[in-house]
């Protein structure tokens, strides 16, 4: 068996969720300059006791939270409009970003790639939201530091029309659909039969 490992992150794409009831998405848009992605799932397990023994074990998937960091979400009109929609901001008639208050951010699918030593991986989180970014800007010293934009991210599980419930799906470079992974968000996810998995 070959030894594999995943290295870095690239190819971030975002697809705005158009219809939360039907789970239809806009075409994924590539976002350049991915620096870092941190993901922390939130899965809680609780045991109820009765008759002096464990009675029911219940696990609940609450999605998760983390941070996605980019060097560039503002260099084009399209990126500024996309991220304004994602954080609940607006664009004015002159093309400026307005830090609007009280507007609901749009939900979206977040897609990215981790190259591998032998096998690469691409992942899609289906129902994400972000907040306006934090950043740390400082004077240029001996070397220029590019300002990094850090977006707090949350995601949650969804139930698709196929009956499948979950938060994300992965594809791998040895699978047939890998080359077209970023073409669209796949919402026709179904479980393999026992014979297909064996």
Model regions and ranges:
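Polar/acidic, low-complexity leader/linker segments enriched in S/T/G and N/D
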Residues: 1-37, 194-198
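N-terminal interaction modules that seed assembly of large macromolecular complexes
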Residues: 30-66
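Short acidic (Asp/Glu) patches
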Residues: 46-54, 87-97, 133-138
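Oligomerization/assembly interface segments of phage tail-like spikes and tubes
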Residues: 53-78, 145-158
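Ordered, amphipathic secondary-structure segments that act as subunit-interaction surfaces
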Residues: 62-104
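Beta-strand elements of well-folded, non-transmembrane domains
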Residues: 70-74, 114-118, 129-132, 155-159
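Short helix-loop boundary/capping segments
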Residues: 99-131
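Mixed-charge, glycine-accented linear interaction segment located at domain edges/termini
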Residues: 128-198
């Amino acid at each position: 068996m070959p030894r594999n490992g995943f290295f870095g992150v690239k190819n971030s794409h975002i697809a705005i969720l158009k219809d939360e009831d039907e789970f239809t998405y806009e075409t994924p848009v590539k976002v350049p300059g991915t620096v870092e992605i941190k993901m922390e799932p939130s899965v809680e397990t609780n045991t109820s006791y009765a008759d002096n023994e464990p009675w029911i074990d219940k696990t609940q998937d609450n999605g998760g939270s983390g941070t996605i960091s980019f060097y560039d979400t503002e260099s084009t009109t399209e990126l500024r409009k996309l991220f304004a929609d994602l954080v609940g901001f607006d664009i004015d008639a002159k093309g400026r970003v307005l830090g609007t208050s009280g507007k609901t951010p749009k939900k979206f699918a977040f897609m990215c790639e981790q190259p591998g030593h032998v096998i690469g991986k691409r992942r899609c989180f289906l129902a994400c939201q972000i907040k306006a970014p934090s950043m740390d800007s400082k004077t240029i010293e001996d070397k220029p530091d590019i300002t990094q934009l850090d977006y707090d991210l949350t995601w949650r599980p969804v139930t698709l029309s196929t009956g499948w419930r979950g938060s994300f799906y992965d594809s791998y470079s040895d699978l047939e659909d890998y080359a077209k992974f970023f073409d669209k968000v796949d919402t026709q996810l179904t479980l393999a039969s026992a014979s297909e998995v064996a």
